Swiss-Prot record:
It is found in: Cytoplasm. Keywords: Cytoplasm, Methyltransferase, RNA-binding, rRNA processing, S-adenosyl-L-methionine, Transferase. This is Ribosomal RNA small subunit methyltransferase A. It comes from the Bacteria. Its EC number is 2.1.1.182. Belongs to the class I-like SAM-binding methyltransferase superfamily. rRNA adenine N(6)-methyltransferase family. RsmA subfamily. Specifically dimethylates two adjacent adenosines (A1518 and A1519) in the loop of a conserved hairpin near the 3'-end of 16S rRNA in the 30S particle. May play a critical role in biogenesis of 30S subunits. S-adenosyl-L-methionine binds at N28, L30, G55, E76, D101, N125. It comes from Alkaliphilus oremlandii (strain OhILAs) (Clostridium oremlandii (strain OhILAs)). GO terms for molecular function: 16S rRNA (adenine(1518)-N(6)/adenine(1519)-N(6))-dimethyltransferase activity; RNA binding. SUPFAM superfamilies: S-adenosyl-L-methionine-dependent methyltransferases (SSF53335).
Length: 287
């Protein structure tokens, strides 16, 4: 197959179609074959897999995925890329391209229509401005996929896998780790993209858990607690939770924190996901 991942080939395609990179869509195309191979390796793509690729660009990564997977559904928001993808992926009968915004799709319905009962994985080179909304859509909607392998800004990847007591630990860390096991696969320098982004990138794989990391009575309460606790990082738990969106009374908080064996003077950034689970469940009994 005619690979398009070299700088020369990519520039030829961009010039042929007079393609204009969109800053608002955060478009950067990969031009390093080793990185592309490493992404597909890291995603553990095998013959029986069905892959949803978000943001195929001109199809460089798509080609590599298609050579290993059973079938690929590429979701591209930019309609000006569709004719380019028809050319670059024309030799791959196992690839279907749809011009859609993944954030507006009913992903359960899509998978039921395209890949019923199949092993589905997601691979994406995401624009940095929509990284978190897209990832959380797959996680919160409990879309039936095995894993998400995503290229994102290094700082966001660091936050996703951070643990208690570290500067990167926050609400995003807990949200991602509630639904999945995150694993950083490789660092990607700006030099392997056209045009070069101003930030370093990281490829991270989120292996979706069969059941959430902790068992909670009310997920909404669990995540509201986490949000309030990290909303005022420098405050003690007692003060952060009593002045957050939940507007909890200090007397109730003292009772629930004591029952959870958590010191009221600790900060939210020191609690494990398990401790947040215990706290949320004890609070649920009182509300």
């Amino acid at each position: 197959m005619d690979r398009i991942s070299s700088p020369k080939k990519t520039k030829e395609i961009v010039q042929k179609y007079e393609f204009k990179f969109s800053k608002s869509l955060g478009q950067n195309f990969l031009i390093d074959q080793n990185i592309l191979d490493n992404i597909v390796d890291g995603a553990n793509v095998s013959e029986g897999d069905c892959i949803i690729e978000v943001g195929p660009g001109i199809g460089s990564l798509t080609q590599n995925i298609a050579e290993r997977a059973d079938s690929v559904l590429a979701v591209e928001i930019d309609k000006t890329l569709i004719p380019i993808l028809k050319e670059t992926l024309g030799a791959y009968p196992n690839v279907e391209v749809i011009n859609e915004d993944v954030l507006k799709l009913d992903l359960h319905k899509l998978i039921e229509e395209k890949f019923p009962g199949r092993n589905v994985k997601v691979i994406a080179n995401l624009p940095y401005y929509v990284t978190t909304p897209i990832i959380m859509k797959f996680l919160e909607e409990k879309v039936p996929v095995k894993s998400l392998t995503i290229m994102i800004q290094k700082e966001v990847a660091d936050r996703m896998q951070a643990g208690p007591g570290t500067k990167d630990y926050g609400a995003l860390s807990i949200a991602v780790q509630y639904y999945s096991n995150p694993k950083i696969l490789l660092k990607v320098p700006p030099s392997v993209f056209i045009p070069q982004p101003k930030v370093e990138s990281t490829v991270i794989r989120l292996d979706i858990l069969d059941t959430p990391k902790v068992s909670v009575e009310r997920e909404d309460l669990f995540f509201s607690l986490v949000k309030d606790a990290f909303g005022k990082r420098r405050k003690t738990l007692l003060n952060a939770l009593s002045t957050g969106d939940l507007k909890l009374e200090k007397s109730l908080l003292r009772e629930v924190l004591a029952a959870s064996n958590i010191d009221e003077n600790r900060r939210g950034e020191t609690l494990t996901i398990e401790e947040y689970g215990v706290l949320a469940n004890n609070l649920a009994k009182k509300l």
